[in-house]
Curated annotation (Swiss-Prot):
The lineage of its organism: Bacteria, Bacillati, Bacillota, Bacilli, Lactobacillales. The gene is mnmE. InterPro entries: G_TrmE (IPR031168), GTP-bd (IPR006073), GTP-bd_TrmE_N (IPR018948), GTPase_MnmE (IPR004520), MnmE_dom2 (IPR027368), MnmE_helical (IPR025867), P-loop_NTPase (IPR027417), Small_GTP-bd (IPR005225). It comes from the Bacteria. Its EC number is 3.6.-.-. Binds 1 potassium ion per subunit. (6S)-5-formyl-5,6,7,8-tetrahydrofolate binds at residues 26, 88, 127, 458. This is tRNA modification GTPase MnmE. Keywords: Cytoplasm, GTP-binding, Hydrolase, Magnesium, Metal-binding, Nucleotide-binding, Potassium, tRNA processing. It holds the Pfam family MMR_HSR1. SUPFAM superfamilies: P-loop containing nucleoside triphosphate hydrolases (SSF52540).
Length: 458
């Protein structure tokens, strides 16, 4: 998708393909009304007010055949998502009818939109910045209401405003430093300039570091916690997974080794998406299929954000249990004592502190797991502070980290007594890095790559 491409008129189906009550075909560009007028039978579109919905029919003018009865939305530039003229044809849902209407539009002068091209035009026409464009995709992909809240705030411009204000402050600082350098005849100008640079650099660094502190929570809410359920065979791992999911998604039997692979499912725990990984029981085995599952389990354990270690409280600790306790001790771990509905035989004093006794069979204390997750990852402070700006995008986090590094370089240079005019280079670099976040200084290749990840019609 070229950045310099002429803005011709584009079209795409904006609703998921398949049967449904309504399908929407979207057109955007200078010729949107002209093309729609060729195939729409109803009111004269050139005389219709903007932002209205109009009843009529879509007709193939070559055959004089009606394709569908529709409601046609007219939205005139610049007060549209793309800041171009936009037509949205609301058809009866279905693969055949929406495709027929799209093909008719393409035959009469529109081009098939590329993935994300409507949002890309909104960006290139100044309707949204890059953070807001990315928030559109985050909103589409949000798995929980908390992830949706963060995406909506970003779409509303919270991160954009913070970054733009910081960039303006950096420019103001650089301009003041430049003025001071240009008038060296004042005796105290060098000291004033150094003091200004130090104060502002520390202020910017503190702001960026505070933003980075939100990254862990934001990334968890956006992408979820990779959660490995581990334990020796037949301690209730798959039953726990099913209990959390409230569905029978994993095989549950009384035969050891029946979970021979890694089973992944998502579950919403108080607004946090947990990617639950039910692993094969980790033990020595000669079964080649089970052996592969065990190796994958060990890999899942290494990569997990959270480990749920399940032990059988109705049996004494085994060597395998002790091995798993040792293997997972450096992880964010919650130890669960399952089968509390049976007589207890495990020695609790041999276990780490803060274990949670549960009975998957009787659904006992499952809610305590949710509370412990909140304690570990959110310091019991709640999931989302509504007035906070969160970093959740890996690209944004990486760029903020680079900006902090540039600011640290300025501070280190000041401590070493380097000339302020040399340190302006690092301060300017910070300004440029922050511009990559909003798209003001992002390379064309990055913009093209970002929008290529969007779905068709968006």
């Amino acid at each position: 998708m070229s950045i310099t491409k002429e803005f011709d008129t584009i079209a795409a189906i904006s609703t998921p393909l398949g049967e449904g009550a309504i399908g929407i075909v979207r057109i955007s560009g200078t010729d949107a009304l002209k093309i729609a007028s060729k195939i729409y039978r109803g009111k004269d579109l050139s005389a219709i007010q903007s932002h209205t919905l109009n009843y009529g029919h879509i007709v193939d003018p070559d055959k004089n055949e009606i394709l569908d009865e529709v409601m046609l939305g007219v939205m005139l530039a610049p007060k549209t998502f793309t800041r171009e003229d936009v037509i949205e044809i609301n058809t009866h849902g279905g693969i055949a009818v929406t495709n027929e209407i799209l093909q008719l539009i393409l035959r009469h002068g529109a081009r098939m939109a590329e993935p994300g091209e409507f949002t890309k035009r909104a960006f290139l026409n100044g309707r949204v910045d890059l953070t807001q464009a990315e928030a559109v995709m985050d909103l589409i992909r949000a798995k929980t209401d908390k992830a949706m809240d963060i995406a909506v705030k970003q779409l509303d411009g919270s991160l954009k405003t913070l970054i733009n204000n910081t960039r303006q402050e950096i420019l103001n600082t650089l301009a003041q430093v430049e003025v001071n350098i240009d008038y060296p005849e004042y005796d105290d100008v060098e000291e004033m300039t150094t003091t200004l640079m130090r104060e502002k650099t520390q202020e910017f660094q503190a702001l960026m570091e505070n933003l980075l502190r939100t990254a862990r929570r934001g990334k968890i809410l956006r992408e979820g916690l990779s959660t490995a359920i581990i334990g020796r065979p037949n301690v209730g791992k798959s039953s726990l997974l099913n209990n959390l999911l409230r569905e029978e998604k994993a095989i549950v039997t009384d035969i050891e080794g029946t979970t021979r692979d890694v089973i992944e499912e998502y579950v919403n725990i108080k607004g946090v998406p947990l990617k639950l990984v039910d692993t094969a029981g980790i033990r020595d085995t000669d079964d080649i299929v089970e052996k592969i599952g065990v190796e994958r389990s060990k890999k899942a354990l290494e990569e997990a954000d959270l480990v749920l270690l399940v032990l059988n409280s109705s049996e004494p600790l085994t060597l395998q249990d002790r091995s798993l306790l040792e293997l997972s001790k450096e992880s964010n771990r919650i130890v669960l004592l399952n089968k509390t509905d049976l007589p207890q035989k495990i020695e609790v004093n041999e276990l780490p502190e803060n274990v949670i006794p549960i009975s998957v069979l009787e659904n006992e204390n499952i809610d305590k797991i949710e509370e412990r997750i909140n304690d570990i990852f959110f310091d019991n402070a709640g999931m989302v502070e509504h007035d906070a700006t969160y970093l959740s995008n890996a690209r944004h986090i990486s760029l903020i980290e680079k900006a902090v590094d540039s600011l640290k370089a300025v501070n280190e240079g000041l401590e070493l007594g380097m000339p302020v005019d040399l340190l302006q280079v690092d301060m300017t670099r910070t300004w440029e890095i922050l511009g990559e976040i909003t798209g003001d200084a992002a390379p064309d290749e990055l913009i093209t790559q970002l929008f290529s990840q969007f779905c068709l019609g968006k």
